[in-house]
Curated annotation (Swiss-Prot):
Species assigned in the record: Mus musculus
Record's comment describing the protein's domains: The first C2 domain/C2A does not mediate Ca(2+)-dependent phospholipid binding.
Protein name: Synaptotagmin-8
GO cellular component, one term: vesicle
Gene Ontology biological process terms in this record: acrosome reaction
Quaternary structure (record): Homodimer or homooligomer. Homodimerization and homooligomerization do not depend on Ca(2+). Interacts with SYNCRIP isoform 2 C-terminus. Binds inositol 1,3,4,5-tetrakisphosphate (IP4). Binds to AP2 in a Ca(2+)-independent manner. Interacts with STX1A, STX1B and STX2; the interaction is Ca(2+)-dependent.
InterPro entries according to UniProt: C2_dom, C2_domain_sf, Synaptotagmin
């Protein structure tokens, strides 16, 4: 009985006694069992393992390269010089290595607070003209952002002034505009180039941003120059002002109606009397249509608020010039033009921008203040300035 029990117990223990060797041999066969259970061919598994290894090695190499690069960068000497504005300011060639204006940090000194201006100067001894290229400005001083534009003039030509277009929302405008001034060689030593930068305000006084006064007698004009110049504070002496005129423009392409609303004027000479505004349309440099406002007496800020409608087909917009002129009776009891504003494809600066805004926003009135310019200067531009192609408004 005991033997039978032992035999039964032995037979009962046999499965457990053989389980130990089975567990011992299960470890080495675990990986092959997993491989056989994956429903992929073996060559795809080998490729996946190889790709993972290459990716891991690449990551390690990238980490090592970044560490070496930072280590070398820290050990570079800091006494190396870079190409800056000082070395290029007195250069006499146009092939200058100029840094990007946006990368220049303003210095703590007072000389840097008004910004910089990049100019190119070229004098033609044959035509006796100096060609001024207004390239760009940088680091202009303003609260927040600004809408800068520039006036360019030469002291020997009173009343002659070039006005750039307005650049919206920037302190580093790219002008890229060129203007010419007639300066005989005998007048070069005493001539001064003046560039004034302004912050455009549509319905208020424009704010000065800085000024450059460059005596041409100190510049070597035997070669083409392109240099950076430091802007100074705005001058205390204001340029000759003939007043300002505010009016709105509205164009409807479907009907071809151009509406001009003369609103008001300000800053007129106190010695003038009975001021009024003439509106004149010119087609192909010939007088086409005209009208005028009522006269306002005894005021330097006359208020008109009078509207005028002209029929101008879309096909004739490229050939039309709009001239608004303030007339007044002076001390000699003779009515003369005080100043003019030219709009159209022959205009420049703010008037050209106003005309373009009218075409871009058809059927909507666009109002703006404009500085009056010399009547002689406007008449000269009408005769000489080539037309600029403008986009036609959508009907």
């Amino acid at each position: 009985m005991q033997a039978d029990r032992s035999m039964k117990m032995g037979h009962a223990l046999n499965p457990f006694s053989t389980s130990a060797p089975l567990d011992a041999t299960a470890g080495p066969s675990l990986i092959p069992d997993l491989i056989t259970r994956i429903p992929w061919p073996r060559w795809t598994l080998f490729i996946a393992i190889l790709a993972a290894g290459v990716l891991l090695v690449s990551c390690l190499l990238c980490v090592i390269c970044c560490y070496c690069h930072r280590h070398r960068h820290r050990k570079q000497p800091k006494d190396k010089e870079t190409v800056g504005l000082g070395s290029a300011r007195n250069s006499t060639t146009t092939h200058l290595v100029q840094p990007d204006v946006d990368c220049l940090e303003p210095c703590s000194g007072g000389d840097q607070q008004w910004g910089r201006l990049l100019l190119s100067l070229e004098y033609d001894f044959g035509s006796q003209e100096i060609r001024v290229g207004l390239r760009q400005a940088g680091n202009l001083k303003a609260e927040g952002t600004a809408d800068p534009y520039a006036w360019v003039s030469v002291s020997t030509q009173s009343g002659r002034r070039h006005e750039t277009k307005v650049h919206r929302g920037t302190l580093s405008p790219m002008f890229e505009e060129t203007c010419c001034f007639l300066v005989p060689p005998a007048e070069l030593p005493k001539a001064t180039l003046k560039v004034q930068l302004w912050d455009f305000k549509r319905f208020s006084e424009h704010e000065p941003l800085g000024e450059l006064q460059l005596p041409l007698g100190t510049v070597d004009l035997q070669h083409v120059l392109e240099s950076w110049y430091q802007l100074g504070p705005p001058g205390t002496t204001e340029p000759e002002q003939m007043g300002e005129l505010c009016f709105s423009l509205r164009y409807v392409p479907s009907s071809g109606s151009l509406t001009v609303v003369v609103l008001e004027a300000r800053g007129l000479n106190p010695g003038l009397a009975e001021a009024y505004v003439k509106i004149q349309l010119m087609l192909n440099q010939r007088k086409w249509k005209k009208s005028k406002t009522s006269s306002k007496k005894g005021t330097t800020t006359p208020y008109f608020n009078e509207a005028f409608v002209f029929l101008v087909p879309v096909s004739q917009l490229q050939s039309v010039d709009l001239v608004l002129a303030v007339w007044a009776r002076g001390l000699q009891l003779r009515t003369e033009p005080v100043g003019k504003v030219l709009l159209g494809s022959r205009a420049s600066g703010q008037p050209l921008q106003h005309w373009a805004d009218m075409l871009a926003h058809a059927r909507r009135p666009i109002a703006q203040w404009h500085h009056l310019r010399s009547p002689r200067e406007v008449d000269r531009v009408l005769a000489l300035q080539p037309r600029l192609p403008l986009l036609r408004p959508r009907s």
